[in-house]
Amino acid sequence: MDRQCAVASLTAFQFQIDRQCSQTRGRACSFHTPHGIVETPRFMPVGTLATVKTVTPAQLRDTGAQMVLSNTYHLHLQPGEEIVAKAGGLHRFMNWSGPMLTDSGGFQVFSLSELRKIEERGVTFRSPRDGAVIEFTPERSIRIQNALGADVIMAFDECPPYPAERKDVEAAVARTYRWLERCINAHERPQDQALFGIVQGGVYLDLRQQAARDLVQLDLPGYAIGGVSVGEPSEEIHRIVEATAPLLPAHKPRYLMGVGTYREMVQAIAAGIDLFDCVIPTRLARHGAALVKGDRWNLKNAQFREDFQPLDEDCNCYCCQNFSRAYLNHLIRSREILGYTLLSIHNITELVRFTTRIREAILSDRFVEEFGHWLQPSAVPVSP
């Protein structure tokens, strides 16, 4: 299926299938947004507070990143969406000219299990900053995201924990659908902000599948699979994606939220997923760890103290082109911020390059040949 083109109902957005893998449901696509094209499959770095931790926008561009994620909940608390709007929106505020996506804040709100109360209207919680009572509703989440101005915005959903009773997950799925309808009605910028719906359902595959079928009827510009990477085994994520992704429209972007390990991304891409985000690259960097050719290295280890080779001699990132493993070992042991910056640059480059290589393999129909080993049970994911 070469160059299949499907244009979303929004004039500023277009999603094009460039090549379909002949052996899996994987595909290479081009997602056109108001701020540029996202070539998928694609890993998106996380810039929660309008910054990818320890990395400048210029450095981020050099990693090959095309789309960046920020968070509605955190930006509402600091500095506030009004400030961002006065600056001209997120892109100008953080000096990022490429596409952006904002999460709805639902995941963060629901992670405050002891501080929040769920009702049909929305969620009330106490701010972890000052204890003030804050209410998040579908309408408020969308208003905040409209003010922030990202290219893609996410519906406010209820993310059940893991593990959770089936009845509780059923209630969360039903409420997520009702809240999505309210998000659609509240959305004031559909021409330049694409609203994605989120499929919930925990580890209950029948609930996931029914949720997907229901959301598809709303004909949104894109769809996400949420509520994963919340403590469940990697095998469960694979089961969820395998059961859910095929039910989402082939002519629209599919986004797997919060996933960014090598194996989990390859498995999801084989199932038809296009977009990923995860804090893994910067979180590992802050712990002195580097992602190198599918493995995880602890740069604090003594073995690197007199190792003057580049971190990865095959990597063209700023870190690997200019500094040795010994220097990185010194920086991390000294707790110098530069060490975290250099490892963040490398780790982001590594995951962006990994998904870029997968795209190239799909375009040449060599995906299974080049990445099939990650589909095997023996392939161990690199945990954050």
Swiss-Prot record:
- Comment on bound cofactor: Binds 1 zinc ion per subunit.
Q: What is its EC number?
A: 2.4.2.29
Pathway per its UniProt entry is: tRNA modification; tRNA-queuosine biosynthesis
Binding site residues for Zn(2+): C315, C317, C320, H346
Q: What class does this enzyme belong to in the EC scheme?
A: transferase
Keywords from the UniProt entry: Glycosyltransferase, Metal-binding, Queuosine biosynthesis, Transferase, tRNA processing, Zinc
Catalytic residues?
D103, D277
Concerning InterPro entries, the annotation shows: ArchSynthase1/Queuine_TRR, TGT, TGT-like_sf, tRNA_ribo_trans-like
Domain of life of the native organism: Bacteria
> Catalyses which reaction?
7-aminomethyl-7-carbaguanine + guanosine(34) in tRNA = 7-aminomethyl-7-carbaguanosine(34) in tRNA + guanine
Please tell me one Gene Ontology term that the record gives under cellular component: cytosol
Quick one: where's region RNA binding? Answer: 258-264, 282-286
Q: Where does substrate bind?
A: D103, S104, G105, G106, F107, D157, Q200, G227
Gene3D superfamilies in UniProt:
Queuine tRNA-ribosyltransferase-like (3.20.20.105)
The prosthetic group or cofactor this protein requires is:
Zn(2+)
Single annotated GO MF? tRNA-guanosine(34) queuine transglycosylase activity
GO terms under biological process: queuosine biosynthetic process; tRNA wobble guanine modification; tRNA-guanine transglycosylation
The record's listing under HAMAP family reads:
Q_tRNA_Tgt (MF_00168)
What does this chain do? Catalyzes the base-exchange of a guanine (G) residue with the queuine precursor 7-aminomethyl-7-deazaguanine (PreQ1) at position 34 (anticodon wobble position) in tRNAs with GU(N) anticodons (tRNA-Asp, -Asn, -His and -Tyr). Catalysis occurs through a double-displacement mechanism. The nucleophile active site attacks the C1' of nucleotide 34 to detach the guanine base from the RNA, forming a covalent enzyme-RNA intermediate. The proton acceptor active site deprotonates the incoming PreQ1, allowing a nucleophilic attack on the C1' of the ribose to form the product.
Quaternary structure note: Homodimer. Within each dimer, one monomer is responsible for RNA recognition and catalysis, while the other monomer binds to the replacement base PreQ1.
- What's the family? Belongs to the queuine tRNA-ribosyltransferase family.
Q: What is this protein called?
A: Queuine tRNA-ribosyltransferase
What is the gene name? tgt
